[in-house]
């Protein structure tokens, strides 16, 4: 898991700090061999991860101390929970059946959640309308309209398995699961949902 506030996503980026770079540097130092990792996803700049999977190839036996060693070497914004052996044909990205994102919106001016939630307290949101719009997402196949402009995607086809808004006090949580996500896709969907919740758009405008 990691706090993505200071990272430009998981994947290595030229001249930018990434989670993958920090993880590979730690693994290579501890295992004394160059290690390359493959993550289950890339995650956008500033996105946090509660549970991110990655795989790497290593021919020797893994020490039980590796998790402790990694957490001692990595910056405090990255935490390794477990290291375990998998089958040779396992692939962190392509073996994943689905991915889940959670997006939080604070309905109050809360400085303590500023790094972890969109502060949207000046105008109320109609959660019912936003959930009505969620149902329309299941009708989509091509999510190109929600992708970052100029993104080099081989295909914009995604399959949504779950999409829902729920409110807990002054916090809204959007949960969405899909087989894959395009760059900036979740943020774009949330932005559109907020437009619907604030009355600037109607759920039917998604069709």
Residues covered by each model-derived region:
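Structured-RNA-binding interfaces characteristic of tRNA pseudouridine synthases
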Residues: 1-207
């Amino acid at each position: 898991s990691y706090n993505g506030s200071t990272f430009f996503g998981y994947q290595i980026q030229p001249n930018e700090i990434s989670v993958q770079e920090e993880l590979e540097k730690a693994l290579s130092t501890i295992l004394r061999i160059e290690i390359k990792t493959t993550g289950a996803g890339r995650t956008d700049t500033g996105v946090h991860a509660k549970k991110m999977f990655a795989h790497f190839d290593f021919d020797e036996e893994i020490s039980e101390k590796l998790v402790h060693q990694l957490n001692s070497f990595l910056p405090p914004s990255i935490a390794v929970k477990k290291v375990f052996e998998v089958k040779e044909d396992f692939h962190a990205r392509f073996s994943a059946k689905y991915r889940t994102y959670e997006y939080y919106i604070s309905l109050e001016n809360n400085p303590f959640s500023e790094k972890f939630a969109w502060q949207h307290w000046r105008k109320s949101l109609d959660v019912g309308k936003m959930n009505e719009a969620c149902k329309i997402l299941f009708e989509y196949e091509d999510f190109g309209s929600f992708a970052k402009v100029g993104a080099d995607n081989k295909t914009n086809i995604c399959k949504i398995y779950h999409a829902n808004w729920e409110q807990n006090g002054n916090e809204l949580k959007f949960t969405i699961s899909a087989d894959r996500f395009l760059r900036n896709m979740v943020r774009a969907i949330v932005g559109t949902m907020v437009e619907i919740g604030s009355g600037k758009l109607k759920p039917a405008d998604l069709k």
